[in-house]
Amino acid sequence: MYLIHFTKEALFDIEDIVLWYEEQRIGLSYDFELCLEAGIDTILRNPAAFQKRHKEVKVRFISRFPYGIHYRIKEKEITVIGVFHTSRSPKNWSKRI
């Protein structure tokens, strides 16, 4: 069983995304949160299944939304370092590694 932790920055990412989607359409943020939760559940079930994007950082793309959950695995611990838009340059998020 893996433990999952979110960095402070990852939590800010999620908060910003949720607020943005709620401004676009009432209830859309809830849809995003459901898809995010499903992505996290998939990571917890099989964290090694997803591709490496940069060094030891893996990404699980979120269904229906253009975001990826970026995380590292160390022993039985998963650390989510960010939730980034797919169009965002790796140079912008690689600073968090």
Tell where the protein language model's regions lie, with residue ranges.
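Catalytic cores of transferase enzymes with a strong primary signal for eukaryotic protein kinases
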Residues: 9, 32, 49, 83, ...
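Enriched for short, Lys/Arg-rich terminal
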Residues: 68, 72-97
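Basic/aromatic recognition patch in beta-strand/loop cores that engages polyanionic ligands
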Residues: 38, 45-78
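Arg/Lys-rich, positively charged N-terminal/basic patches that mediate binding to nucleic acids
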Residues: 1-33
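Residue-level recognition of specific faces of alpha-helices
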Residues: 8, 13, 17, 39-42, ...
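Residues in soluble alpha-helical coiled-coils and helical-bundle/repeat scaffolds
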Residues: 1, 23-26, 44-48, 62
